[in-house]
Amino acid sequence: FRAAQFGIHHFCTMALNPREANDDRVNDAVMAVLPRFLEKDGVLGIGEIGLDDQTKKEEKYFTAQLELAKQHDLPVLVHTPHRDKKKGFQRCIDLIRDCGFPMARILLDHGNEETIKITREVGCWQGFSIYPNTKMDVHRMVAVVREYGVERIVVNSAADWGISDPLMIPKLVQA
């Protein structure tokens, strides 16, 4: 509604983020209202869902939201852990498979050079978050694109936690 007041057709994904999945003050309340938001115009998928600290609660809400995505025929944006990334990527893939969700409708985000091989093997989309000091930087991303091409790759930047630069994508294009 707010974006439309300024002539902007806003698109987004909606979810209980894994960072909040462990917070009993909000997790069930968010899950209770989430289905009604998934019906709204402009909601293109469910996400970010996934794992952060790789807890049983995160797994519970991850699989519950995968089921919602199936019910609403929506693609899924998956947050993968920043720590113990390879293990977390594999656990996300295992949970997705266990739910029977189509891999081609999954974007596994926050990837790196180590995870691109995994996503290529299973048929997911691979997301890369470009940050100035953490996650992927411009030069590492250029190397990934040179080696693997751009097929099934999504690159994003952010202005969220800590030091970030929302203009990293134009900087990547110039590199």
Regions found by a protein language model. Give the residues of each.
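Mid-to-C-terminal alpha-helical segments outside catalytic/metal-binding sites
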Residues: 170-175
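Short hydrophobic/aromatic-enriched beta-strand-loop microsegments
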Residues: 104-105, 125-132
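Short acidic active-site motifs
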Residues: 114-115, 140
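Short acidic/histidine-rich active-site segments
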Residues: 148-166
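Mid-domain alpha/beta scaffold segments of enzyme catalytic cores
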Residues: 1-73, 78-95, 110-114, 121, ...
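Short helix-capping segments at alpha-helix termini
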Residues: 4-8, 98-102, 148-149
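Short, charged, surface-exposed secondary-structure boundary motifs
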Residues: 23, 135-142, 164-165
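Short, acidic/turn-prone active-site loops that include or flank metal/cofactor-
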Residues: 130-135, 159-160
